[in-house]
Amino acid sequence: PASAARGALETMEWQIGLFDSLPKESQTAFLMVSAENIDRIVPMMDSMVAEWLAGDADGLAELMNEGLTDPALADALLYKRNENWAEWINTRLERPGTVFIAVGAGHLAGQKSVQDYLTQRGLTVERVQ
């Protein structure tokens, strides 16, 4: 409903600051890979959506991670954020009320996904369709 409380797991300022916190080499490598693969973005997104709709989390994780060869980049863009979100979710679930959380599908696939971190905190996680 329109009266429902809304919030964000991260602010835009925080996300921009995330890139500033990366080593310059990681920033440059990410920019170069992004520029070199600009023509592959739409087909890759289509493949990612197909993997998600098929319920193939491993296939989605493989697609997501093929461009994250820099450990500092993977840690900053995915793993630490997933862990932070899982902690927020775990804490929020201790309070009454209904919570709807939406994140990009890439955060829900593979090792160190949001689900992995929630499971480590003793929560039961299952995909529903």
Residue ranges and their predicted role:
Residues 1-94, 114:
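Hydrophobic, often amphipathic alpha-helical segments used for membrane interaction and targeting
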Residues 98-129:
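C-terminal structured interaction module
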